Every structure is written in structure tokens, then in C-alpha cells.
């Protein structure tokens, strides 16, 4: 029988495993801590891994601030395959031959995604149109017009070149769909592409290196978890007096 536990307050950095939704992560932590007031500051797709900022107790009050911070990612883009979800979890819609691009050509194409821009969200997303999440419409084979959203990409670097794949490092504003950048890059190159892997490495000052895996957190006694919590005033010093 689960015993009532001390109510905790603070920010906990978690390394999300693949094949978990962001809701799955929150649910596991709620069971571990036996408390409901737990949220997060930025969704990761099931395929993606890496940093999730979990908000426990009173830390849920700074959700909007933490969600607004820039994110950093490392990932892999695969050329030649287009999927319906724009990532490796989706069904392949088309396969095209990949031209013998040079590293310089890939870097030049990536440079075209730098700076301020408007991005059309993918159909496989939780954004609602007329009250219906886009992914529900997409699963039924439908498609609706989506309003482009402002984003900013402040860095987009090539870190490994091995066609048909290449690795990258990216820093962007909230609400940026990295898989859409991968898809759109493939369209510009004329051979299609999808996001093959993604790992969030930072959200502003919060780093993946300081996070624990879910399994590690679940194995810790409550006092040890409490020691890992970042106080609310420290997580958001500019808005907490």
C-alpha cells in the first residue's frame, strides 16, 4: 500500500527515455512521490530523449517562465525518406535517391534555417484547430490548414557527416518543431528527409548532464530525491522574490 508522503516543492531534471511520452514521465514521478501536483516545462516527442524539467508542487507556478526558455538539441537527420510524422516513428511516405552531396552543400542548406522565421506546425502535433488536436485529424487521414508560428534558430551546426545521415546541434526558441526543420531541409535538398534521432541537451541554464534517468530516480529514497530538487527561487530568480 502506498503511504502518504511529504509534499515536495522544486524543479527536478530528468533524462527522458525513448518510447515514453512526456505524460508517461510525469505519471511515473507521480507514482514515485505519491503526489499529483507535478507538471513539466516542455514536451518531448516519444521518440526523443533527453532533458525534461519536472515541476513539483509550488514549482508548477513557474511553468510559463521555464517553458519560454530556449532549448538545445543534438540529433540525426536521414535523407531520402519522408514520413508522415516527420520522424522515425512515422510511416514512410516516399523514398528517393540521395545525391552525392558534399559536406559544404549540407552546411549551406542548414544555414538557410538560421535566424527568425515562421514555421508551419506538423499535422502530427498536439496543437488544436477548432478544439481538435491535429494528430487526431492526421490519424484519420485528414489535413487542415495550420497557422505558421514565429520561431528563431540561433545555431544549427553539422557535427557528423555520413550520408544518407548527418548529425547536428541546434539551439532554438520554444515551440520549434525540430522534426519539421528536418522535413523542410529535405524538401529544399530535393530528396526528402526525416528526423532519425533527437536528444534535448539543455533548456537555457538547465543541462542534461545534471539530470537523472527515470530508473535512477525511482530507485532513490525520498530524502535523496529531495536533495536533487532545485528550489523555485533558484530556478526562476527573475520572477520569484
Swiss-Prot record:
Keyword Cytoplasm: no
Catalytic function, reaction form: uridine(55) in tRNA = pseudouridine(55) in tRNA
Keywords carried by this UniProt record: Isomerase, tRNA processing
Active site annotation, chain numbering: 45 (nucleophile)
CDD domains: PseudoU_synth_EcTruB
SUPFAM superfamilies: Pseudouridine synthase (SSF55120)
InterPro entries, alphabetized: PsdUridine_synth_cat_dom_sf (IPR020103), PsdUridine_synth_N (IPR002501), tRNA_psdUridine_synth_TruB (IPR014780), TruB_C (IPR032819)
EC number annotated for this UniProt entry: 5.4.99.25
Keyword tRNA processing assigned: yes
GO MF term list: RNA binding; tRNA pseudouridine(55) synthase activity
A GO BP annotation: tRNA pseudouridine synthesis
Family in the record: Belongs to the pseudouridine synthase TruB family. Type 1 subfamily.
Function: Responsible for synthesis of pseudouridine from uracil-55 in the psi GC loop of transfer RNAs.
NCBIfam families: TruB
Protein name: tRNA pseudouridine synthase B
Organism for this UniProt entry: Opitutus terrae (strain DSM 11246 / JCM 15787 / PB90-1)
Amino acid at each position: 500500500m502506498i503511504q502518504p508522503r511529504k509534499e515536495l516543492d522544486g524543479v527536478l531534471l530528468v533524462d527522458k527515455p525513448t518510447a515514453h511520452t512526456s505524460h508517461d514521465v510525469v505519471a511515473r514521478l507521480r507514482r514515485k512521490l505519491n503526489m499529483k501536483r507535478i507538471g513539466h516545462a516542455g514536451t518531448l516527442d516519444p521518440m526523443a530523449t533527453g532533458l525534461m524539467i519536472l515541476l513539483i508542487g509550488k514549482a508548477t507556478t513557474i511553468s510559463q517562465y521555464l517553458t519560454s526558455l530556449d532549448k538545445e538539441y543534438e540529433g540525426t537527420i536521414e535523407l531520402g525518406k519522408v514520413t508522415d510524422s516527420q520522424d522515425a516513428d512515422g510511416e514512410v511516405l516516399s523514398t528517393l535517391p540521395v545525391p552525392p552531396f558534399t559536406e559544404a552543400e549540407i552546411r549551406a542548406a542548414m544555414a538557410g534555417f538560421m535566424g527568425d522565421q515562421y514555421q508551419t506546425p506538423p499535422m502530427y502535433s498536439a496543437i488544436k484547430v477548432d478544439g481538435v488536436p491535429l494528430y487526431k485529424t492526421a490519424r484519420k487521414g485528414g489535413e487542415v490548414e495550420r497557422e505558421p508560428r514565429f520561431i528563431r534558430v540561433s545555431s544549427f551546426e553539422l557535427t557528423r557527416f555520413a550520408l544518407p545521415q548527418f548529425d547536428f546541434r541546434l539551439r532554438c526558441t520554444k515551440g520549434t518543431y525540430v522534426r519539421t526543420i528536418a522535413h523542410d531541409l529535405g524538401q529544399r535538398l530535393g530528396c526528402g528527409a526525416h528526423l532519425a534521432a533527437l536528444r534535448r541537451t539543455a533548456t537555457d541554464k538547465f543541462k542534461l548532464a545534471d539530470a537523472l534517468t527515470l530508473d535512477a530516480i525511482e530507485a532513490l529514497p525520498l530524502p535523496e530525491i529531495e536533495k536533487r530538487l532545485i528550489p523555485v527561487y533558484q530556478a526562476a530568480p527573475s520572477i520569484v522574490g
